[in-house]
């Protein structure tokens, strides 16, 4: 091992050290193993179920299983449900779980207490909040978003506009900030782009929308648990996000939504289910919305899924946000630099900004044969994913991804390209999930 730790400290930042061409040329796997040994987050890796022989770089699509999750879910089934039966709704706090877990997520995203609730899916929550935003801005008919936004965001807006049929429109532009105007009711943006990993300046975009009289709805699906967020400080109006990526809540984990306290009393939602009623067990035939964020709950909460999600969220809350972000930046800088160094002639075009302040916790590369290359990597134990038409994505969740994982992943990528294994016909057939 060379003096990597000392040199890193001397440079003042990981990115300055890693991107120094001279030092990078002499960096060894042993240097990175030393960095892993000194990593203040290293112990978190042991709290996840990670198969031997696998480098898991797809936590931006589905987080791995926290080791505490199976036991917690089994306890809910056998002890809470098994013994308390229907009494568990109150005795074990099931009925309060959307608000309880929501407030925990609220701490992760910097939202005010009582602003966040767990409910439904990201798509459904988008629909609910887009409809509420249009209702809150009568006379403004445009939902504004950007080219390349995640498809479900676009689909839900398209469906809502078609359903309303009152002259509303979805406007998709390359420069949403420049397109803000008096007809825009809500600016809908994804904070970290699903394909490239590029990240918006949340405070600046929110301020610009407010200056134009519009509300802002942020999709935090690739942000929550991955980058520092300050919804309250940035004066964010509305937000949604999913629970199965960086929050490690499990496949199909329920999503969350967040509404600024100043907007909650006037929030009129299009889905008015019984658990969003002011008195659900009064069984009033007329709907009256619950106070605050509770009105955003529609139906009976998925208790088992919420229990799994809560384990993942509790784990995230134990990790210092500053250390998470610092390591995320280092991992991405290392990955980008190693690919540029080891795969310079292999046709990989970085999609992810080199500037750490402009990206989330993933790196992506465009390649015309990206799908086949990713399948070849997966067969070799390096699990990332592919997004059409040509993007290879590598999620860098700092709770369990090590510096040596990045080194080893790029080494496998280099070898796959060197021997051309990705050309095998079995890697050409698209699976239903990519």
Where are these regions (language model features)?
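Pyridoxal 5′-phosphate
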Residues: 3-434
């Amino acid at each position: 091992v060379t003096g990597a730790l000392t040199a890193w400290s001397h440079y003042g930042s990981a990115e300055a050290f890693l991107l120094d061409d001279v030092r990078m040329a002499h960096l060894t796997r042993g240097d990175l193993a030393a960095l892993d040994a000194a990593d203040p987050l290293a112990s978190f890796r042991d709290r996840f179920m990670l198969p031997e022989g696998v480098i898991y770089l797809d936590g931006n699509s589905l987080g791995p299983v926290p080791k505490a999750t199976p036991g917690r879910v089994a306890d809910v089934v056998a002890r809470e449900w098994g013994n308390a039966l229907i009494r568990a709704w109150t005795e074990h706090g099931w009925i309060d779980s959307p608000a309880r877990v929501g407030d925990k997520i609220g701490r992760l995203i910097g939202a005010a207490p009582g602003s966040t609730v767990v409910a439904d899916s990201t798509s459904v929550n988008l629909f609910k909040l887009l409809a509420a935003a249009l209702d809150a801005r009568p006379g403004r008919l445009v939902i504004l978003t950007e080219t390349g936004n995640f498809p479900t965001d676009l689909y839900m807006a398209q469906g809502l506009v078609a359903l309303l049929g009152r002259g509303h429109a979805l406007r998709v532009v390359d420069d949403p900030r420049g397109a803000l105007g008096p007809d825009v009711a809500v600016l809908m943006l994804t904070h970290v782009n699903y394909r490239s990993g590029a990240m918006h300046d949340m405070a600046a975009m929110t301020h610009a929308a407010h200056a134009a009289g519009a509300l802002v709805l942020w999709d935090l699906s690739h942000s929550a648990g991955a980058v520092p967020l300050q919804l309250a400080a940035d004066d964010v109006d509305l937000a949604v996000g999913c629970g199965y990526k960086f929050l490690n809540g499990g496949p199909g984990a329920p999503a969350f939504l967040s509404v600024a306290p100043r907007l909650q009393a006037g929030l009129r939602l299009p889905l008015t289910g019984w658990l969003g009623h002011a008195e659900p067990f009064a069984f009033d035939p007329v709907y009256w919305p619950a106070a605050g964020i509770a009105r955003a709950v529609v139906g009976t909460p998925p208790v088992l899924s919420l229990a799994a999600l809560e384990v993942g969220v509790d784990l995230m809350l134990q990790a210092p946000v500053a250390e998470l972000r610092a390591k995320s930046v280092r991992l991405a800088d290392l990955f980008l630099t190693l690919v540029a160094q080891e795969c310079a002639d292999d046709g990989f075009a970085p999609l992810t900004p080199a500037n750490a302040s402009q990206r989330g916790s993933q790196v992506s590369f465009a390649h015309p044969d990206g799908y086949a290359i990713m399948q070849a990597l997966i067969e070799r134990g390096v699990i990332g994913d592919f997004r059409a038409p040509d993007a290879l994505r590598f999620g860098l969740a700092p709770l369990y991804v090590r510096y040596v994982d990045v080194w080893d992943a790029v080494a496998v990528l280099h070898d796959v390209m060197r021997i051309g294994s990705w050309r095998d016909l079995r890697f050409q057939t698209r699976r239903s999930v990519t």
